[in-house]
Amino acid sequence: MTIHIGARPDQIAETVLMPGDPYRARWAAQTFLDGAELVNEVRGMLGFTGTYKGNRVTIQGSGMGMPSLSIYANELISSYNAQTLIRIGSCGGMQPHVAVRDVIIAMSATTITSPSSGIFREVNFAPTAHYDLLAAAVTAAKAKGTRTHVGGIYSSDVFYAERPDLDEQMVRHGILGVEMEAAELYTLAARHNRRALAILTVSDHLQTGEALPAEDREQTFGDMVEIALEAAFA
């Protein structure tokens, strides 16, 4: 048990999926896991452990933003020995060829700042995914026939941005989408020699203004969860 996770050490699997939304964690566990049991509800941040095709997996909510994710990822790694951490969540599309409902598999995550920024000082550390997980996710996405993009994303530290020039530079440099957590997850995984990946569903588009209707989100997000689970145990 930690400050933010109330589970016993034996209740958390070595493979953890991390949606930001705790209700999405509950939905994913009920939909895709066998024998899912609630293992955490501290501060309403729900976590469940069950099995997927015989493999033990935990789905733990992480909240919004890098500071929140950093708390849960740190505790999962240091106190529960999590070895594989996969963020599953939504993002905003940034490139014209990236459409709402598409899935982005994040090869790298650019950020201006993160909870780890103070460690690097003048160094611009490049947070990247674990290659084996990345390759397995691409294979799983192709097998499902899911429209998928692989490349860099932008992890912002604000949701209501006041710097449109930053978005312009991200688009100019080929960034596929924007979210708020992956850069810190990749940094922590590198520091602790763990496997990490972010798989994201494009729920809205910054250029077109298109947004995914609420009734379509469940099925679209389901593709993302299945890709993550298949990649984790490939």
From Swiss-Prot:
Domain of life: Bacteria
EC number: 2.4.2.1
Residues marked Important for catalytic activity (site): 217
Chain positions recorded as phosphate binding sites: 20, 24, 43, 87-90
Active site (record annotation): 204 (proton donor)
Any one GO cellular component localisation term in the record: cytosol
Catalytic function, reaction form: a purine D-ribonucleoside + phosphate = a purine nucleobase + alpha-D-ribose 1-phosphate; a purine 2'-deoxy-D-ribonucleoside + phosphate = a purine nucleobase + 2-deoxy-alpha-D-ribose 1-phosphate
Keyword tags: Glycosyltransferase, Transferase
First-tier enzyme category under EC: transferase
Biological process (GO), any one: purine nucleoside catabolic process
Molecular functions per Gene Ontology: purine-nucleoside phosphorylase activity
CDD domains according to UniProt: PNP_EcPNPI-like (cd09006)
List of residues binding a purine D-ribonucleoside: 4, 162, 179-181, 203-204
Disulfide bonds: none
Description of how the protein assembles with itself and partners: Homohexamer; trimer of homodimers.
Function: Catalyzes the reversible phosphorolytic breakdown of the N-glycosidic bond in the beta-(deoxy)ribonucleoside molecules, with the formation of the corresponding free purine bases and pentose-1-phosphate.
Family designation: Belongs to the PNP/UDP phosphorylase family.
Protein name: Purine nucleoside phosphorylase DeoD-type
Originating species: Roseobacter denitrificans (strain ATCC 33942 / OCh 114)
Taxonomy of the source species: Bacteria, Pseudomonadati, Pseudomonadota, Alphaproteobacteria, Rhodobacterales
